[in-house]
Structure formats: structure tokens, C-alpha cells
Amino acid sequence: LEKFGMKMLAVGDHGGYVMNEHGLKVSEIDEHVQKHGSLKGFYGPAYGYVRGVPIHKDEFFALETNVVIPAALEMQIGEEEAKHMKCDVIVEGANGPVTDKADEILKQRNITVVPDILANSGGVLVSYYEWLQNKQDVKWTEDDVLDKLDGKMAMCYTKVAKIAKEYDCTLREASFIYSLKSIEKVYQKRGIE
């Protein structure tokens, strides 16, 4: 996301939560976690500036920001977190990071949730591309794979967003509708009722 001009205000893991209002450097976070196994200790002066300050989990989920990406744990965002979140969009990078009750609260608060079924399906898609290359005995470059992935993910998001608008529902509900309609088409082609 850095390459698109976005800055990471905060990050958290089992070792704690860290914030820097000027933005955290992903490369430094990666280096620290590789060396220490968690974010624990990733704060204070380093490299000639303050990398970040430790914050509590409650502060983390109440930060005013555009996007929150829960990318590690299931049920990370429950009712309490949902009540206090100050973001426009949640992109589910993990499987099931938002509980059902939290999802309802976020819906009532007009916070858009890009569901896991849509947001984190890239790995499965790339596995399919790998299978396809092996099946066809061809080799794509990394750029080819990323281009295909970007195109497919954008197309799926566009279709799901259109369904959400058409049915006046959430992106999660629209993802399920899209999936069921896709299965229905296959059944119809095969003559299955």
C-alpha cells in the first residue's frame, strides 16, 4: 500500500500495538518481526527518529483512519471494537476477522466491510494460475501473474459492488449472492435443477 501513497498509522500483533501518526515503515516492521518474532519492542528512537509509540488494543481499534486491515486472526473485531471504530472501510485480510454481531454494528454505522471471501482470495487464485501453467506447460512471469490477479480481483470487486447496489445489501451479502449465482449458472449449463 505504501507504493500507492498510503501510510500505515498503526500495526498490531501478539506482541503489542504500535502507532506513528507520521506513518510506520513496513520494511522496518518486517525486519523487526523477523528478528524478534513480534512487534514487541518496536518503538522509541531508532534510525535517528521515533519509529512508533506503544498503544493499547482499544486505542488501536479506535484510531481515526481511512482503512483498517485485520490480517491475522479470526474474530479480531468484536462488538466493542466495532462500536468505537473510526474508519471508512475494513478490508478483511484474515479469514473471519469480524464477528457476526460486529458486522451488524458496522453496517448500522455505515462502515464498509470488504469481506474475506472477496478480499483475501488472491492466494487461492494464484494457486489456480500455478495449476493452469502446469496443465498447459507454460511459464508466466511474476508480472504476468500479478496482472492477471489484479484484473480478476478488480473484476470480482466491481461485480460484487454492483450486486450490493442492486440489492441494497452489504458487500459480504453481495459476495454470497455472486457466488450462488455463479454456481446456479454452472448447474444450468449441466442441466442440474
Where would I find each of the regions flagged by the language model?
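Glycine-rich phosphate/diphosphate-binding loop of Rossmann-like nucleotide-binding domains
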Residues: 1-62
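Short, flexible loop segments at the rims of nucleotide/cofactor-binding pockets, characterized by
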Residues: 45-49, 67-70, 90
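Adenosine-phosphate binding glycine-rich loop
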Residues: 83, 87-193
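Rossmann-fold NAD(P) dinucleotide-binding segment
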Residues: 55-65, 73-90
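Short helix/loop capping segments that flank catalytic or ligand/cofactor-binding pockets
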Residues: 19-21, 78, 100
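Structural motif
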Residues: 7-10, 66-67, 88-90, 111-112
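Short glycine-/small-residue-rich Rossmann-like dinucleotide-binding loops
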Residues: 72-73, 95
